[in-house]
């Protein structure tokens, strides 16, 4: 996951001359603990989006409010982390919840899918899912063979769209 944040932070700086304080990472309150750690390591501000207690779905109204507050506070570039199976609940975020609001308010973003937990299961059990690279709004995906396939540590996989990795080379 941190690779995505590193790439997108640098992408915004390289392509838009963004300042660090103009970049923010947005993820649900159920996201993996590596997400806030990665934001901290890269000195990226972070917004934690509340979820519904029963369904664990992103609270759209609060997300919109948080995005508008961030914009009013000078945030211009948004790194979005959408979960494909959280470790605590197995919940899957709908990336469209994020992208529809970001686009409605004309906010610049990159969308990362954290599929470390569910990436080896969810796509195969949900044939109609658009949480894959057929969705042009998705910039990167993380999957981890350690979590579901019982492979050794260090078998995490990060995949991003062509041209993005150059921002960290």
Stretches found by the model and what they are:
Residues 3-168:
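Conserved PLP-enzyme active-site core in the AAT-like
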């Amino acid at each position: 996951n941190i690779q995505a944040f590193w790439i997108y932070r640098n992408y915004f700086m390289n392509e838009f001359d963004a300042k660090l304080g103009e970049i923010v990472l947005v993820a649900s309150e159920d996201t993996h603990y590596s997400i806030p750690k990665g934001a901290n390591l890269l000195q990226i501000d972070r917004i934690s989006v509340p979820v519904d207690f029963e369904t664990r779905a992103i609270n759209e109204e609060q997300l919109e409010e948080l995005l508008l507050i961030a914009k009013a506070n000078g945030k211009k570039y948004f790194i979005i982390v959408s979960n494909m199976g959280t470790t605590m609940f197995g919940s899957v975020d709908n990336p469209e919840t994020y992208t529809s609001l970001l686009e409605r308010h004309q906010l610049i973003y990159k969308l990362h899918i954290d599929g470390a937990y569910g990436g080896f299961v969810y796509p195969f059990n949900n044939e109609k899912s658009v949480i894959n690279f057929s969705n042009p709004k998705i910039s990167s995906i993380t999957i981890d063979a350690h979590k579901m396939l019982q492979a050794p540590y260090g078998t995490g996989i990060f995949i991003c769209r062509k041209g993005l990795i150059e921002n960290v080379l």
